[in-house]
């Protein structure tokens, strides 16, 4: 999953390695939908080796190798899911809102659903304040993902 950040005003991109994700869509009552995702920081990168090393240090990846997001509430309006949940980084949990936009028509029979995901948070809220203000506080998660229908 792609994330964006800024160093000295210049934009950079990295990738969080998703190890587990779940998006159970309740087609009859979308507010009953559930979203969760888990990232492995040790397999993630910040775009180039020096930044990746710094990211792992700042996020204390050796002690806390996983980042998780668990939804607490989901609203659906105008083909968008607004997913309020808790993001856990460095063993610190803070509320974050994800916007999940459906990119094409779907229904309960769809085998795949394509959607974009976007979230913004401030890393210093999680105690990840290394290299600030050179590396800005805002982290933006933005990507296009494919949801495959579960065979359960």
Residue ranges, per PLM feature:
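Low-complexity, acidic/polar, glycine-enriched regions of mature
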Residues: 1-152
């Amino acid at each position: 999953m792609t994330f964006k950040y800024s160093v000295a005003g210049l934009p950079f991109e990295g990738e969080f390695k998703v190890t587990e994700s779940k998006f159970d869509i309740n087609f009859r009552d979308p507010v009953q939908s559930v979203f969760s995702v888990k990232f492995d920081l040790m397999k993630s990168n910040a775009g180039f080796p020096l930044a990746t090393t710094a990211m792992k240090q700042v996020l204390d990846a050796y002690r806390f190798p996983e980042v998780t997001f668990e939804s607490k509430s989901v609203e659906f309006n105008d083909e968008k899911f607004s997913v309020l949940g808790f993001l856990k980084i460095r063993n610190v949990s803070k509320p974050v809102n994800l916007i999940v936009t459906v990119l094409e028509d779907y229904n309960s029979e769809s085998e795949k659903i394509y959607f974009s995901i976007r979230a913004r948070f401030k890393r210093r809220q999680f105690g990840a304040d290394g290299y600030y203000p050179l590396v800005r506080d805002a982290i933006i998660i933005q990507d296009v993902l494919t949801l495959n229908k579960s065979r359960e």
